[in-house]
Regions:
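C-terminal functional regions that serve as terminal interaction/effector modules
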Residues: 27-166
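Intrinsically disordered, low-complexity linker/loop segments enriched in Gly/Pro
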Residues: 1-35
């Protein structure tokens, strides 16, 4: 579920894993993970054709490098909740989980450079937490999906456009 959309997603089909073509797919439209099907996992049947294309593209990816988790910068605090993960009560409304960081308290759009591409620090740390995670970066297409593989599966994450340094 950590790779699926959350309850605030405007695309309901992203909230739970999807079962199709012998795989379980989980995505929030920014990151995608694919593992062999497991009948014990609750999932929706059928997935959009564009997800299947990612499997073909993954087969073309190369130059996978192990992710050095210790080299990932420390997370900055989410500016929306000041790192608490909670939006405070306002008027008669109760406290609720911060929609920006999904309760983690971490700034999700903190930019990290990986070769010629840039990725959200939050996603890089999430990928690095997977067993034997390796990342493939494109040196000539900075906005191309970044593919990764790990023990038992593979995935891709969309890079972020570098912010101008002014």
């Amino acid at each position: 579920a950590k790779f699926c959309g959350n309850q605030y997603s405007d695309r309901e089909w992203l909230i739970a894993p999807i079962r199709d073509h012998g795989f379980l797919w989980a995505t929030n439209a920014e990151i995608l993970v694919c593992v062999p099907d497991d009948p014990n996992v609750s999932a929706k049947d059928g997935c959009p054709a564009n997800l299947i294309k990612f499997h073909e593209w993954f087969k073309l990816a190369g130059n996978f490098n192990k992710i050095n988790a210790e080299a990932i910068p420390k997370a900055k605090r989410c500016p929306s909740c000041n790192g608490s993960g909670i939006w405070p009560a306002f008027g008669d409304d109760p406290e609720e989980t911060c929609q920006e960081c999904n309760g983690s308290g971490e700034y999700k759009n903190q930019e990290v450079s990986v070769g010629a591409q840039h990725i959200s620090r939050w996603y890089l740390a999430l990928i690095a937490s997977l067993e034997n995670a390796q990342l493939s970066c494109s040196s000539d297409a900075p906005t191309a999906p970044m593919f990764f593989k790990f023990e038992g599966g593979w995935g891709c994450v969309m890079p972020i456009k570098p912010r101008s340094k002014s």
